[in-house]
Amino acid sequence: RVGISPMTPPQVFVELWPRIQEQYPKVKFKLVPFENTPENAREILANLGQNIDVIAGIFDEAMLELRKCNGVELSREPFCVAVALHHRLAGKKVLTPEDLKGERLLMMRKGWSCYVDALRAELTEKYPEITIADFDFYNVDIFNRCENSNDMLLAIKSWESVHPLMKILPVEWDYKMPYGLLYAKDPSEKVEKLVRTVEGITK
């Protein structure tokens, strides 16, 4: 049972599916949609294994600790920037930190992730012309807010389908965040087997 929402799309399973099935032919996936709210995120991640077994998304050690779940890393996703289609930078293929000068960049609040905090520290020190604004939770609302206000949003490429009027652009910086599967601290045999299979494939 794979939990899916706009921020946690099941794309990774689509990509890995042929190889997973090759090694674990009995595996069956059931997609379980859920609404991306702070309450749901807390509830679902703390109770993985009850209604939902795995979720694909970004994470770090602090988040796993806070949410009391495990994570298996599949890749490191580069931080990108989401902009409205009518934004002055939307026509560019790749951005540089210099491009962001004079812009307002929305980033998850300090302390949410050491990876975001490291990027924030560099931008604050080297590019004071970029205004950094905090927010508390990634969901469709924050994309709507940026589309309406012309603010920029720190994002990852797999969120491209979240908002049709927003474009996700790569940036020339070397900041990434772990992306993978979140699962229960005490997983069922099936989930344990899936995790081991995925680990074997992605090594």
Question: What is each model feature region?
Answer:
Residues 66-79, 83-105, 191-192:
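Flexible hinge/capping segments at coil-to-helix
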Residues 1-5, 55, 82, 106, ...:
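Short, well-ordered beta-strand segments
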Residues 30-34, 131-135, 169:
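General small-molecule cofactor/ligand-binding pocket signal
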Residues 65-72, 77, 140-189:
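Beta-alpha-beta core module
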Residues 12-13, 103-126:
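Secondary-structure junction motif
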